Amino acid sequence: MGRVKMSETFSYWIEDNIYPKKWDIIYKQRENQVFLIKINKGSSEYIIVSERFNETMSNSFEIIKIERIQNKSLWRNFDESRKRLNEKYQVSNLDFLESTLFHGTRANDPKLIFSSKVGFDIGKSSFGNYGIGLYFALNASYSNNYSFEESPTSGCKQMFLCRVLLGNSAPPTQKELKNDSTQDSIKGPGGEMFILKSNHTAYPDYLISYRQKVIVNNNTNNNNKNKNKNNNKNNNKNIKIQNENKNENKIENKNENENQFDNYGFNTNFSQNLYDKYGLKYPSQEKPKPGFFTPNKELEYEIFPLLFEKNEKEEELEELEDYQLALLLSTSSLGSK
């Protein structure tokens, strides 16, 4: 892949008077102000820039946001350099003069570049493989190795997409490495890297923020789903067992209650039911005391005579539905009178 053709790919970059047409609210921007405009996803501008990034970047990365940089003084310096280059070669071919390339700032905050009046400063550059200069890459994947990281924990990385004046660009010679060349820029092997030797020959047009994609492992998700299903099954099974145990306990308690006997030797539940039926106050499990029974008037004449004559009327008592109650009462002090 050679230079990106500005005339075909970035036709929307055509300037209106001095500044690019794409610049927003330029009439509100003061001379000393720098605007960082977030580009809306879905806009033609966003699509063009994102495609330029994605086509030369590993698909393991994704764009977080794209911001357009609007620095008036920085742009004017770049525009003046472009005019001089055009006068030098007297060409109308925009592709010869200008290209779009990526640049990573390493540990330096990109803000130090796009908010300054100089921009990319060759005086602050270090000696690289091709001498001192401003290094730009054709591929985003190359600049990714030199990208700026906001913080180790955020995972956000940043790089510039720049407008670069290449002019007459050729592979380096020993003379050019000493920064004593008449060429406008140096072309690295394969044309994938370009080195500029003077200031104001590159403009940081966009700041691209991106990050590593979060890869979801489907196998892990499936395992987690199966694990959750098994946990639910086990929980349901445990609930079922608990309910069964509760029912068993109820049955056991019921059986225990049914097998409980009072001080008179009779089944407690049955005795209670009989007392309730006849409106009697159920005695405590203590030994009965004289007069603790409180039968109603009707029962006083129906049951008590039978109790006092139980020896003579044993057969009648046996026929009574409430035989157990009669026996209970007969063991009391009332029945012994």
UniProtKB/Swiss-Prot annotation:
InterPro entries per UniProt: ARTD-AVP, Poly(ADP-ribose)pol_cat_dom
Presence of keyword Glycosyltransferase: yes
EC number in record: 2.4.2.30
Any Pfam family matching the protein: PARP
Superkingdom of the source species: Eukaryota
Catalytic activity: L-aspartyl-[protein] + NAD(+) = 4-O-(ADP-D-ribosyl)-L-aspartyl-[protein] + nicotinamide; L-glutamyl-[protein] + NAD(+) = 5-O-(ADP-D-ribosyl)-L-glutamyl-[protein] + nicotinamide; NAD(+) + (ADP-D-ribosyl)n-acceptor = nicotinamide + (ADP-D-ribosyl)n+1-acceptor + H(+)
UniProt domain PARP catalytic: residue ranges: 21-231
Comp. bias regions, Low complexity: 218-242
Keyword terms: Glycosyltransferase, NAD, Transferase
GO molecular function annotation: NAD+ poly-ADP-ribosyltransferase activity; NAD+-protein-aspartate ADP-ribosyltransferase activity; NAD+-protein-glutamate ADP-ribosyltransferase activity
Region (Disordered): 218-247
Annotated protein name in UniProt: Probable poly [ADP-ribose] polymerase DDB_G0278045
Organism: Dictyostelium discoideum
